[in-house]
Amino acid sequence: MTAPEPKHFRLYFKFESDALTDESNLKVPEILAAVTRLAVPEVVVIGHTDTLGDRKANKALGLKRAMSVKGVLVDAGIAPALIEVASHGEADLLVKTRNNTAEPRNRRVEISVR
């Protein structure tokens, strides 16, 4: 029996914040359903930012965003040990931009559930 394909989710954040957008908050139940369907899930949450600000601050903000999502999942009953978090900061842009460019689609976390 082969393992199921990982499910991928993308959540977006408000400017310079670890608060999810209203639209992204609506996606949380879908993520929880994907996690709870699996006997022993592995969840990877990677935080990202746009290029406003310096790289070090953006790396920290990306981690803060990933930890915020982990907190939402843990509060919903997912074991913390099942969730890995990391930050790419501004290093892995969804939408390529010049430095110091505001781009809401880059303010995100990428979630993989398998």
Segments from the language model and where they lie:
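Periplasmic peptidoglycan-binding/tethering modules of Gram-negative envelope proteins
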Residues: 1-42
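Periplasmic OmpA-like peptidoglycan-binding domain that tethers envelope proteins to the cell wall
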Residues: 46-114
